[in-house]
Curated annotation (Swiss-Prot):
Probable chaperone. Has a low intrinsic ATPase activity which is markedly stimulated by HscB. It comes from the Bacteria. This is Chaperone protein HscA homolog. The keyword Transmembrane helix does not apply. Disulfide bonds: none annotated. Pfam families: HSP70 (PF00012). GO terms for molecular function: ATP binding; ATP hydrolysis activity; ATP-dependent protein folding chaperone; unfolded protein binding. It comes from Vibrio parahaemolyticus serotype O3:K6 (strain RIMD 2210633). CDD domains: ASKHA_NBD_HSP70_HscA. Keywords: ATP-binding, Chaperone, Nucleotide-binding. Gene3D superfamilies: 1.20.1270.10, 3.30.420.40, Actin, Chain A, domain 4, Substrate Binding Domain Of DNAk, Chain A, domain 1.
Length: 617
């Protein structure tokens, strides 16, 4: 008789076989790949000994080039050389053109409104461009490690939404990589530092890359990494420092906009080189198309100071969300190449009141953390007790009668998570229910973001309030949401995977949070009014239906007139804006209809007992 082999989920069926896995930091400006070798997580270098791969792809008619060689072509072939593609994932063409009007690419819109880049090699979408970067990193890992990869962990900004996360996974699939997990970049940094230093307590991870900024407040305790709160800006990074400096140099050189694509790229390269030099020098000599001059670090810092302050505002919000004071933060982990900027380190240190940690290369720390996590998920460390708890950035809810939002999963809930709540029908004989999934902190649907709608059909016709519909929200480890609605008596159910078409920027997330606090009082007043209106509608509809069914038999003409007057008075109040007045009107109507309700109850009891003997009862 054959034996059935049993293995732990996600782990090798051959427990002593070491599986090859890698962590990939898919960055806006640069990307890296890391793996655990001989017990240590290290980044994997190319043939020239470089760990960094520029996130740049050049498409010529003959070939696809990725990395440094592609970057070298950017100045001469800007339309065919795609840079910072991470900013484009999960966004509509309209959104991209409004956010980044100076991009040198030739865009066109696909049938579903998504962006397509026209290159010498043909049309490419952002997912295909990302896939080419991932393919190059996967190839480097397999050549260095000497075998096929069992899987990869890919890092994403903490504020990437469903569309951006799904796009990243699709890119990996296109690159032929098996994704073990998507991991938030700040969480990956915490893994790298947490395991190395054995810290326990509250840690802030300040991640300023080329195109995105993330702040995460984490609590590290006995191997458990819990993200208390996150914040950031998906459209702020070192690239913006470059653009500000480029604009300044353009002004100093007396150049007029717009520049040609080639000159624009050359100017950005000068700005980037100048910015990097300021990490070592107080002033830099520049040559901008024949104009020669000196730029000081102080001038550069004056340009970027407002942007650094903007990151600190996000830090302040994240601390408030985590219910943590800046003084409670034990360590500040610096992540991302842009944290090499001296002003950034100085202002972050002043804000938190301590010198930031920079002992691990800020360019490599995220990839190293991802490499450690990939090694664990591949099953190479079955005894690992490390637990990872990410959070959702905005509450997930459902629309109820009156345009109200009922929150199912509150913001900053750790994931993966599943929450269920029961709802019922509003009208007699209702056989279908529309489920509207929303995201946000406000009390009314109109003030939140719509994610998806679907219908549950086949509900047995019953009296209003008799049906029981269980709605379940489930967010997986990658932050993707699925919603299920099930009618309990029949088991009929409907389900939807929520993948919004376009991304929600961190500025929009921050604005939604700020609006929820600014409008908290008026939101609660609006909710109270909506709730009373819904209750008034229920009372009015119920009383009218009862009078149509039994009014002629159980009520005198005068009693009918009195009840109709009560209904009219309640309708008038219901159409007003005074929640307290509507509540009182409901009480008055209930009181006026009390005798009628008693007579209907008596009639129902008599009908139920008709034809039965005492012994039967």
């Amino acid at each position: 008789m054959a034996l059935l082999q049993i293995a732990e989920p996600g782990q090798s069926s051959a427990p002593h076989e070491h599986k090859l896995a890698a962590g990939i930091d898919l960055g806006t400006t640069n990307s890296l790949v890391a793996s655990v070798r001989s017990g240590d997580a290290t980044t994997l270098n190319d043939e020239q000994g470089r760990s960094i791969l520029p996130s740049v792809v050049n498409y010529s008619a003959e070939s696809t080039v990725v990395g440094y060689d592609a970057k070298a072509k950017a100045e001469f072939e800007p339309e065919n050389t795609i840079i910072s593609v991470k900013r484009l994932i999960g966004r509509s063409l309209k959104d991209i053109q409004s956010r980044y009007p100076s991009l040198p690419y030739r865009f066109k819109e696909s049938d579903n409104g998504l962006p397509v880049l026209q290159t010498a090699q043909g049309d490419k979408n952002p997912i295909e461009v990302s896939a080419d970067i991932l393919k190059a990193l996967g190839k480097r890992a397999e050549e260095t490690l000497g075998g096929d990869l069992a899987g990869v962990v890919i890092t994403v900004p903490a504020y990437f939404d469903d569309a951006q996360r799904a796009g990243t996974k699709d890119a990996a699939k296109l690159a032929g990589l098996h994704v073990l997990r998507l991991l938030n970049e700040p969480t990956a940094a915490a893994i790298a530092y947490g395991l190395d230093s054995g810290q326990e307590g509250v840690i802030a991870v300040y991640d300023l890359g080329g195109g995105t900024f993330d702040i995460s407040i984490l609590r590290l305790s006995k191997g458990v990494f819990e993200v208390l709160a996150t914040g950031g800006d998906s459209a702020l990074g070192g690239d913006d420092f470059d653009h500000l400096l480029a604009d300044y140099l353009m002004e100093q050189a007396g150049l007029e906009a717009p520049l040609s694509a080639e000159k624009n790229r050359a100017l950005l390269n000068i700005a980037t080189a100048t910015k990097i030099a300021f990490s070592e020098q107080d002033s830099v000599e520049v040559d901008v198309f024949g104009w020669k001059g000196t730029v000081t670090r102080e001038q550069f810092e004056d340009l970027i100071r407002p942007l650094v302050k903007k990151t600190l505002m996000s830090c302040r919000r994240a601390l408030k969300d985590a219910d943590v004071e800046a003084e409670e933060v034990l360590e500040v982990v610096m992540v991302g190449g842009s944290t090499r900027t001296l002003l950034v380190r100085e202002m972050v240190g002043e804000f938190f009141g301590r010198t930031p940690l920079t002992s691990i290369n800020p360019d490599e720390v995220v990839a190293i953390g991802a490499g450690i996590q990939a090694d664990i998920l591949a099953g190479n460390k079955p005894d690992s007790e490390m637990l990872l708890l990410d959070v959702i950035p905005l509450s997930l809810g459902i629309e109820t009668m009156g345009g109200l939002v009922e929150k199912i999963i509150p913001r900053n809930t750790t994931i993966p998570v599943a929450r269920a709540q029961e709802f019922t029908t509003f009208k007699d004989g209702q056989t279908a229910m529309s489920v509207h999934v929303v995201q946000g902190e406000r009390e009314m649907v109109d003030d939140c973001r719509s994610l998806a709608r679907f219908s549950l059909k086949g509900i047995p016709p019953m009296a209003a309030g008799a049906a029981h519909i269980r709605v379940t929200y489930q967010v997986d480890a990658d932050g993707l949401l699925s919603v299920t609605a099930m009618e309990k008596s029949t088991g009929v159910q409907s389900e939807i995977q929520v993948k919004p078409s376009y991304g929600l920027s961190d500025n929009e997330v921050a604005n939604m949070l700020r609006d929820s606090m600014t409008h908290a009082k008026e939101d609660m007043q609006a909710r109270a009014l909506a709730e009373q209106r819904v209750e008034a509608d229920r009372v009015i509809e119920g009383l009218i239906a009862a009078m149509q069914a039994d009014g002629d038999e159980l009520l005198s003409e005068q009693e009918k007139q009195d009840l109709l007057k009560a209904i009219e008075a309640l309708i008038e109040l219901r159409n007003g804006d005074d929640a307290n007045a509507i509540e009182q009107g409901i009480k008055d109507t209930d009181k006026a209809s009390q005798d009628f309700a008693s007579r209907r109850m008596d009639k129902s009891i008599r009908a139920a007992l008709s034809g039965q003997s005492v012994d039967d009862i």
